[in-house]
């Protein structure tokens, strides 16, 4: 029996952990060196609720320099992972400011999973000290949940690519969301060529 194919696109600020999340899930290895992504694709097989699914994983660049290139990733998307980092309250602020408007524009009826990356850094003393200097603190679970409600996300999950905690759950949840029937006049992402 042929696998069902679904397309997953990951968005979020630069350095918020998108690429590490994808690499840990698809290759089971944690990259120790940060190299900003321009555009990467991975494929991973996952079984959810007895269904074999081939997930096309589309990594995107979070930096503003790529704001005009990123929409090329959106056509035919089945689910969005919208990421922020627990050690960067600013990356959570950018969810409603930047990422939701962009995704809702190009993918109006695609389910969004809000993902808190780098969960392991929430209790890291060095991170807490650095954030305290700027009168900030790591993002709390309640803040993430509240944001998920605010943006009407399909679900909210937390994970750590470094410890692998929660990684599989993120992709299982995303796959379930991608498999659900969509409602609304527009199925999936609009073809960005029409809007550019």
UniProtKB/Swiss-Prot annotation:
Localization terms from the record: Late endosome membrane; Cell membrane; Nucleus; Cleavage furrow
Kinase listed as a keyword: no
GO molecular function: GDP binding; GTP binding; GTPase activity
Motif Effector region: chain residues: 34-42
One of the GO biological process terms: endosome to lysosome transport
Glycosylation sites: 34, 37
SMART domains referenced in this protein's UniProt entry, alphabetically: RAB (SM00175), RAS (SM00173), RHO (SM00174)
Prodomain positions: 194-196
Reported induction: Up-regulated by DNA damaging agents like H(2)O(2) or ionizing radiation (IR).
Topology term for the membrane: Lipid-anchor
GO-annotated cellular components: cleavage furrow; cytosol; early endosome; endosome membrane; extracellular exosome; focal adhesion; late endosome membrane; nucleus
Stored Gene3D superfamilies: P-loop containing nucleotide triphosphate hydrolases
Outcome of substituting residue 14 to V: No effect on internalization of EGF receptor but decreases trafficking of receptor to the lysosome with associated accumulation in late endosomes
Post-translational modification, as annotated: Prenylation specifies the subcellular location of RHOB. The farnesylated form is localized to the plasma membrane while the geranylgeranylated form is localized to the endosome. (Microbial infection) Glycosylated at Tyr-34 by Photorhabdus asymbiotica toxin PAU_02230. Mono-O-GlcNAcylation by PAU_02230 inhibits downstream signaling by an impaired interaction with diverse regulator and effector proteins of Rho and leads to actin disassembly.
ADP-ribosylasparagine: modified positions: 41
Functional description taken from the UniProt entry: Mediates apoptosis in neoplastically transformed cells after DNA damage. Not essential for development but affects cell adhesion and growth factor signaling in transformed cells. Plays a negative role in tumorigenesis as deletion causes tumor formation. Involved in intracellular protein trafficking of a number of proteins. Targets PKN1 to endosomes and is involved in trafficking of the EGF receptor from late endosomes to lysosomes. Also required for stability and nuclear trafficking of AKT1/AKT which promotes endothelial cell survival during vascular development.
Family that this chain belongs to: Belongs to the small GTPase superfamily. Rho family.
Name of the protein this chain belongs to: Rho-related GTP-binding protein RhoB
